[in-house]
């Protein structure tokens, strides 16, 4: 855990009060949601509330982290995004592709763990570094629509230099302004305020943005016309928020299975303790291990291995040796663990039996998605819809920034409601197996509509050099055959 994560709770306590005063707003994020986000984050970091080494011997296997990783992997499988139509579209495509290629799975995993994160253009013209990823404790919601869409938000940025704390509050919201004719117009406003403090528990005094070199190029107030959506995208889980029905924020994928995750850790810990305590021990009467010396004293004559113990009491002359063979309840433990895993699968939106403890290998595994796993497929598809919605909103925000930075206007197909999502987004079919994909690709290759090179690389495992060598050899054989060589002269 880094420094800022350690002081996060302290910062948020004063951040709410001070930021509300600075911008004359009220946050609509409830304490219940903030506390839940903290709890979910602790769980996926391996510190769930039910683990206390001082009071119990429960250890966590952090199944919640695995659940988020597995789900993000399935949801983002082979994800690609194509934004086309103009020079501007090409720039936007580079920004989105950089995110998809390097970060999207990790960010979806974060979203699944804490309920939602914000994707926000930062004003950079570098496509590889244009998008910021904001966790829930680094923003506060000020306004929402009746549909639950976020309309206003304050973001907090932090710097620590020479033991001095610097904070920048960035407030995004819609307001109104009158044009020359006196008509009211909607305006998107971004306000930036900087603060300097010697303490981590207050914003301190207000300073100018240019007092901090990293923020010197940022305008204090920016007004943008003709904006219909916020210039950020909220990537949230597609689950109903029953913790706070009025909140626009999402909930963790495992929020409804906390007790089952606790039960799983208990069951796994008991299984581990049982294995640890299962060592075969042989008890031998100590009289049989010693000899009587002068004066009637008895001295030890044998150095015992770790699996042999001497015992003064409990053994008589007729039973010099006693065997202790601990009972292993492995089968019962595994049955119990699989029962818990089945309930976790159900309560997290997966088909029963999606996660099992393999009796042969002793490993926790996820079963292959089959055609009858309707719950799993529906959950993954719902998550994919959330991803597409967030990416479309992010594309919209980047397009507005293109206007601000003078990038030539042009058609962007991803912003055209008449363009189907299938033309913009591609996800791997959950129900298609590798063999099915290879068979389909092979048939298309035979028909001449699928690249031979692509087929050999994706489905036969050859690299470009090997494919080049194969094509060259094939071309040489064809040339020799046409010229009468390659046994043709015989």
Question: Where on the chain are the PLM-derived regions?
Answer:
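Extended, regular secondary-structure scaffolds
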Residues: 118-249
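Short amphipathic alpha-helical segments
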Residues: 87, 96-104, 256, 260, ...
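A glycine-biased, small/acidic residue-tolerant capping/turn segment at secondary-structure junctions
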Residues: 393-422, 467-470
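Extended, charged amphipathic alpha-helical segments
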Residues: 4, 212-371, 375, 407-408, ...
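Long, highly charged low-complexity segments enriched in Glu/Asp and Lys/Arg with interspersed Ser/Thr
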Residues: 458-488
């Amino acid at each position: 855990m880094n420094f800022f994560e350690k002081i996060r709770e302290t910062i948020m306590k004063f951040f709410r009060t001070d930021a509300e005063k600075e911008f004359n707003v009220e946050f609509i994020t409830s304490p219940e949601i903030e506390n839940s986000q903290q709890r979910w984050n602790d769980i996926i970091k391996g510190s769930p509330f039910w683990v206390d080494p001082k009071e119990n011997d429960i250890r966590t296997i952090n199944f919640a982290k695995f659940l988020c990783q597995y789900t993000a992997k399935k949801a983002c499988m082979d994800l690609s995004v194509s934004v086309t139509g103009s020079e501007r579209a090409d720039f936007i495509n580079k920004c989105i592709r950089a995110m998809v290629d390097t970060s999207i799975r990790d960010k979806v995993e974060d979203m699944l763990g804490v309920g939602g994160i914000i994707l926000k253009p930062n004003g950079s013209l570098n496509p590889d570094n244009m998008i910021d990823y904001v966790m829930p404790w680094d923003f506060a919601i000020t306004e929402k629509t009746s549909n639950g869409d976020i309309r206003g938000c304050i973001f907090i940025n932090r710097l620590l230099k020479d033991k001095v704390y610097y904070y920048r509050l960035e407030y995004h919201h819609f307001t109104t302004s009158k044009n020359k004719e006196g008509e009211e117009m909607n305006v998107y406003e971004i306000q930036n305020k900087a603060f300097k403090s010697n303490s981590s528990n207050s914003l301190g005094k207000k300073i100018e943005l240019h007092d901090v070199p990293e923020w010197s190029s940022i305008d204090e107030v920016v007004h943008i016309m003709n904006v219909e959506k916020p210039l950020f995208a909220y990537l949230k889980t597609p689950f109903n928020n029953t913790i706070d029905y009025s909140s626009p924020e999402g909930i963790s994928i495992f929020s409804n299975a906390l007790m089952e995750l606790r039960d799983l850790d208990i069951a796994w810990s008991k299984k581990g303790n049982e294995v640890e305590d299962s060592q075969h021990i042989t008890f031998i009467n100590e009289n049989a291990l010693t000899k009587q010396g002068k004066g009637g004293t008895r001295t030890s004559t044998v150095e015992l291995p770790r699996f042999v113990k001497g015992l003064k009491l409990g053994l008589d002359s007729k039973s010099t040796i006693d065997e202790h063979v601990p009972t292993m309840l492995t089968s019962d433990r595994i049955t119990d663990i699989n029962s818990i895993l089945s309930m976790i699968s159900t309560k997290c939106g997966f088909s029963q039996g999606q996660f099992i403890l393999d009796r042969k290998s002793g490993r926790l595994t996820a079963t292959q998605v089959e055609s009858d796993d309707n719950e799993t497929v529906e959950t993954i598809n719902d998550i994919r819809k959330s991803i597409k919605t967030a990416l479309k909103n992010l594309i919209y925000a980047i397009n507005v920034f293109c206007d601000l930075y003078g990038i030539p206007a042009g058609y962007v197909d991803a912003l055209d409601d008449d363009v189907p999502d299938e033309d913009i987004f591609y996800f791997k079919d959950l129900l298609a197996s590798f063999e099915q994909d290879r068979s389909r690709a092979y048939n298309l290759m035979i028909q001449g509509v699928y690249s031979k090179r692509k087929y050999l690389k994706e489905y036969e495992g050859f690299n470009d050099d090997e494919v080049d060598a194969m094509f060259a050899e094939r071309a040489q054989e064809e040339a020799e055959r046409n010229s009468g060589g390659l046994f043709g002269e015989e």
